[in-house]
Amino acid sequence: TADRMVLVGAGGVEHEELVKLAEKHFSHLPVAQNPIRLGENQYEPSRFVGSEVRVRDDTSSTCNIAIAVEGASWKSPDYYPMLVLQSIFGNWDRSLGSSPLMSSRLSHIVSTNNLANSFMHFSTSYSDTGLWGVYMVSENHMNLDDMVHFTLKEWQRASTGPSPAEVERAKSQLKASLLLGLDGTTAIAEDIGRQLITTGKRATPQEIEVAINSVTPAEIQRVAQKYIWDKDIAIAATGRVEGLLDYNRIRADMSTLIY
């Protein structure tokens, strides 16, 4: 229906011409009897339940693991703090020549002990909730527990107080990633449309920069305690999963500070 559609123009587009094209091509679309305003959720918030799915495939040379907690929705005030938290732990790939020198503390641990081929943290938001976690690939099947253990220990460290230096570094990396990604009309149009559908408004690059700059170490500690500390996790694993320990053993690492 027309109320579920967003038409965006970016670049050298005349507003009047865009309106004429919209009337020509989309004026026939029906309108819902009870239209939902953009950015509003018509359903009850989803409930996150900790669980796991493992698919063993011994023909694979690697084990692929995703671990996530419930994250922040698009409209949550914790949206940007959770993105900064994701940036603190970052991504790592052993194929990078500078991988042992990357600023993420977790990358040093993984690189030094050859625990994984790569890892990537993510913060995925939806209209009512989100997923925050990590995706890991490893061919070191006998040390999967170490990889998971040290990853979750780093998560818990954020709950006790991240350093101001790593928070500032993560904020700079996040701003560069978000703002430099708007490098063309296609990316800008996609960004405008996504924000309008999910939040009902568009945050300008300046507003995004202000929101990220306002995140403090205390704010990171707060969201880490809210979303990570002793929270249930969802695990999905495929490949050589025989070295991945029991769910309850992994879940216990969400509330212990023992290295």
Per-segment meaning from a language model:
Residues 88-92, 96-115:
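M16/MPP (pitrilysin/insulinase) zinc-metallopeptidase core fold and M16-derived inactive scaffolds
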Residues 92, 116, 120-185, 257-259:
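M16/insulysin-pitrilysin zinc metalloprotease superfamily fold
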